[in-house]
Amino acid sequence: MAWSRPVGWALDHLVYRTSVTGKSNVPTGGPVIFAGNHISFLDGPVMFGASPRPMHILVKQEMFKGFLGRVLTASGQLPVDRQGDRAALQRSKDLLAAGRCVGILPEGTRGSGEASDINGGVAWLALNSGAPVVPVAILGTRAGDEHLDFVPRPGRRFHVSFGTALTLGRRAGESGRASMDRAAQEIRAALAGHVRDAIQLSGQPLPFAETSKDLTAVAGTPADDH
């Protein structure tokens, strides 16, 4: 996995021009869940390259084919079936238990990136691992009315901002489902708020909202376990 860090850095700083803020918000040790907004297929790699710590990102299982699949496997990324993949969540939990970092794009599909809705996988992971969640705002990877599959030209300016970490836990007398719903709402609110703050700081807006969602993105997965 070590070789993938320079590759991620090169994508952010040689192919594109990525400004990064909030690195000091990322815990320097122990497990961390990075939860980013999702507007482009580049979001996962850009978040990976901007992070001060290496991470394993949940990637749709269909990407693990051929040469790209070998690269993803060798760099430590995690295949996930987004229709519901408890095994992927358990693998992520095991990595967090070992003090590693996991990246997830909990909106689940590419869209406007406002984090108006997220899936339950990130909440399950936070509650069952105890790892802090760092909201990550990713801006510039898609803009205006660019298509969901748009490939930005080299040299475009991106912005990645790491927000304040939040730690979630179960409350006394709270059911598993209630804990999941509350945790998901707290993560969603933190991510949405951080995206708004990053827009004001960087001056880079989100793309226009699309009426149809694409289902071929790096994402988390819903979890019904309590």
Where are these regions (language model features)?
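Short gly/ser/thr-rich secondary-structure transition/capping motifs
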Residues: H13-T21, Q83, R142-D145
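Alpha-helical membrane-targeting segments
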Residues: M1-R17, K65-S75, V151-G155
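A secondary-structure boundary/capping signal
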Residues: G22, A35-N37, V59-K60, L105-P106, ...
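Structural motif corresponding to alpha-helix initiation and N-cap regions
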Residues: V20, K65, R86-L89
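Non-catalytic C-terminal accessory region of glycerolipid acyltransferases
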Residues: R86-H226
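Catalytic core of membrane glycerolipid acyltransferases/transacylases, capturing the structured
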Residues: H13-L14, V26-G84
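Short amphipathic alpha-helix with an adjacent loop that forms part of the alpha/beta core around
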Residues: S24-V26, K93-D94
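Short, basic, glycine/proline-bearing loop/turn elements
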Residues: V7-W9, A74-P79, L105-R110
